[in-house]
């Protein structure tokens, strides 16, 4: 039993010393010497939400700019795409599709199919639709200057090969 009393006394002595240390620390530190700044030095920032909104609007602006570039790029036709349109149109004309030209007559049916296809494309009545950047586009959706440039190039090649 005597041992138990010693343990209790020992524990109670430590507690009082610990409490004394806390009191000394509280008395020794003031707000001026503390690591924590006083509340008066804190700045209330009201513009934090505006910074977030500005960043969000900036991202939205960048997204709109990318979409505009993508739309402009989509409107440019490549030589590969125009060759695909011509090939598909030729294939459908061979399978019996009627030419969609403004002056359709018996003479049109006697013309070379390549002439009919080029006439359809130049008039904008070619029924072939291609998918580019997730959009379905007809010949009318593309840049007219680029389309004309590629058609002229293809026609020159056909003339050299004596097909046109």
Swiss-Prot record:
Which keywords does UniProt give here? DNA-directed RNA polymerase, Early protein, Nucleotidyltransferase, Transcription, Transferase, Virion
Residues of the region (Disordered) are 1-39
What terms describe the molecular function in GO for this protein? Answer: DNA binding; DNA-directed RNA polymerase activity
Composition bias (Acidic residues) maps to 1-35
Gene Ontology cellular-component terms for this entry are: DNA-directed RNA polymerase complex; virion component
| Keyword match Cell membrane | no
User: Which reaction(s) does its UniProt entry say it catalyses?
Assistant: RNA(n) + a ribonucleoside 5'-triphosphate = RNA(n+1) + diphosphate
Q: Which Gene3D superfamilies match?
A: 3.90.940.10
Single biological process term from Gene Ontology: DNA-templated transcription
Q: What is its main location?
A: virion
Please state, per the UniProt record, what induces or represses the expression of this protein.
Expressed in the early phase of the viral replicative cycle. Expression seems to continue throughout virus infection.
Q: What is its EC number?
A: 2.7.7.6
What InterPro entries would the database entry show?
DNA-dir_RNA_Pol_19kDa_poxvir, RPB6/omega-like_sf
Highest taxon of the lineage: Viruses
Q: What class of enzyme is it?
A: transferase
Cellular compartment(s): Virion
Q: What does this protein do?
A: Part of the DNA-dependent RNA polymerase which catalyzes the transcription of viral DNA into RNA using the four ribonucleoside triphosphates as substrates. Responsible for the transcription of early, intermediate and late genes. DNA-dependent RNA polymerase associates with the early transcription factor (ETF), itself composed of OPG118 and OPG133, thereby allowing the early genes transcription. Late transcription, and probably also intermediate transcription, require newly synthesized RNA polymerase.
- Assembly information from the UniProt record: The DNA-dependent RNA polymerase used for intermediate and late genes expression consists of eight subunits Rpo30/OPG66, Rpo7/OPG90, Rpo22/OPG103, Rpo147/OPG105, Rpo18/OPG119, Rpo19/OPG131, Rpo132/OPG151 and Rpo35/OPG156. The same holoenzyme, with the addition of the transcription-specificity factor OPG109, is used for early gene expression.
**What is stated as this protein's family in its record?**
Belongs to the poxviridae DNA-directed RNA polymerase 19 kDa subunit family.
Name this polypeptide is given: DNA-directed RNA polymerase 19 kDa subunit
């Amino acid at each position: 039993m005597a041992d138990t009393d010693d343990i209790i006394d020992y524990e109670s002595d430590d507690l009082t010393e610990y409490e004394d240390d806390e009191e000394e620390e509280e008395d020794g530190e003031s707000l001026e010497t503390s690591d924590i700044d006083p509340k008066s030095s804190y700045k209330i920032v009201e513009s934090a939400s505006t910074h977030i909104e500005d960043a969000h609007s900036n991202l939205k602006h960048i997204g709109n700019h990318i979409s505009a570039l993508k739309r402009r790029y989509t409107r440019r036709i490549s030589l590969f795409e125009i060759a695909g349109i011509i090939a598909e149109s030729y294939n459908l004309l061979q399978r019996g599709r009627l030419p969609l030209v403004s002056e359709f007559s018996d003479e049109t049916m006697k013309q070379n199919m390549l002439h009919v296809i080029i006439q359809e494309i130049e008039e904008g009545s070619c029924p072939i639709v291609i998918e580019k950047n997730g959009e379905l586009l007809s010949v009318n959706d593309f840049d007219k200057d680029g389309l004309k440039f590629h058609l002229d190039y293809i026609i020159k090649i056909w003339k050299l090969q004596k097909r046109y």
